């Protein structure tokens, strides 16, 4: 178990400590459950009313909440960012593997860097290159000529197909498959003809990929994930997709082939993105967004019907089905109004 002094926390977060610099913490906890030895944080001012009852050893807050803290206070610019840094420093998550398991199958010509760990029943095929401090969990498969950079970690049962390239400091969760064939077929008189997927997948540095996500290899060019991208669980990323630097994609999202997503984009959960389109840098798509055409300007985009009671939703759905009929009736009314405007009144009989 890692233990840190509050002085060390101040160094890690860049914050200003008000209190005992020698006090010790060993874990992070939510404000309402924190006890002695815990560090907690306040990022939303509406919860400041609970500060007085908090029992944590130290609370990370902004300047405006410091006087409300009943114990040691660590004043930081962004308490949530500070929480992330402290959680990393105190992280006690076990490693997927230690050393090289006797049951691991490793090709004779595979190149392993210093301090590599490979778990039980993992398979490392011919021509694979693993950088320094790489960790391969139990049951992983690393295909021929794949390359993994320094400090990259794979949890159990990750599959990396042949010639896939993964950068340094990446983290891939269990069940993810990278480099399977893209969905490429030609149709000749009703018969499907498979198109060999001759490209690969290139993943940059500091990329994190959640559990059971699939990233397909390119048909001719590569599928590309740039540096600092974070990808949640259970996404489908099709062949030749390109995801730009620093983007974040939430769970359940499906991206069709050859779409290009810009830098610093945020894609909400369960979104569906059409193929062969481009999304500009800095675009945010809210959850369950359906993107059918390119987005050329940064900003926030939404689609779909927000949650309603079932009764309200049924009424809304009924209205949606009547839109075409209502449109026709409206056009007919507009035409009648136009015709009535063109008819001039006959005032000759009034004299």
Curated annotation (Swiss-Prot):
Pathway, per record: Bacterial outer membrane biogenesis; LPS lipid A biosynthesis
SUPFAM superfamilies to which the protein is assigned, alphabetical: Trimeric LpxA-like enzymes
Highest taxon, organism lineage: Bacteria
Top class in the EC scheme: transferase
Keyword Repeat: yes
One MF term in the entry's GO annotations: N-acyltransferase activity
EC number: 2.3.1.191
Family membership: Belongs to the transferase hexapeptide repeat family. LpxD subfamily.
NCBIfam families in alphabetical order: lipid_A_lpxD, PRK00892.1
Protein purpose: Catalyzes the N-acylation of UDP-3-O-acylglucosamine using 3-hydroxyacyl-ACP as the acyl donor. Is involved in the biosynthesis of lipid A, a phosphorylated glycolipid that anchors the lipopolysaccharide to the outer membrane of the cell.
Protein name per its UniProtKB record: UDP-3-O-acylglucosamine N-acyltransferase
Organism of provenance: Vibrio cholerae serotype O1 (strain ATCC 39315 / El Tor Inaba N16961)
Lineage of origin: Bacteria, Pseudomonadati, Pseudomonadota, Gammaproteobacteria, Vibrionales
